[in-house]
Amino acid sequence: ERLQRSGLFEGVSVTLDGDAGKADAAAVTVRLREAPLQQATVGVGISANTGPRVSLEHLHRRIFNQCATLRNKVEWGAKRKAWEGELASHALPGLYRNLLGGAWESVESDTDRVYSARVRLGRAYETQRHERLWFVQGEQVRVRPFDTSTAASAGTRTDTTSATLNFHSTWRELDSI
């Protein structure tokens, strides 16, 4: 499971030699099928709220020849434009991963355009039973109305900034099925 969660392999199989005569020194065979170094996905579609769009997602599993994965997703549509990215270290000792992420989005409605940006720095811990994610996040949202001719519509222009400290945790206790 750890090998599969790393995202570096397309397929993992582990077999144990079942010969009872070799029980003290049983052979374990691990077969791995490595995932490609880079992967790109192109999408074309229509969103119910924002209309037609195209997207491109790119994943590099060893960016700058470092033990890190870089993921970027760009979406371009008639009313929505967005970018989301994450740089994550491969598993470190103790099964931790360091994370750095960001996002930017512009969404247009009939009355205004909303811009949002986010940056996140954190650390993740993932095992079969436990998942923990700690991160600090900064976010900014700007709302810009199209009609600023009246005092009421000009007053709807807003800027909001936030900084948060976050912790997510999952614990699983499952019977073998």
Q: Which residues are covered by each model-predicted region?
A:
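Gram-negative/organellar outer-membrane beta-barrel architecture
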Residues: E1-I177
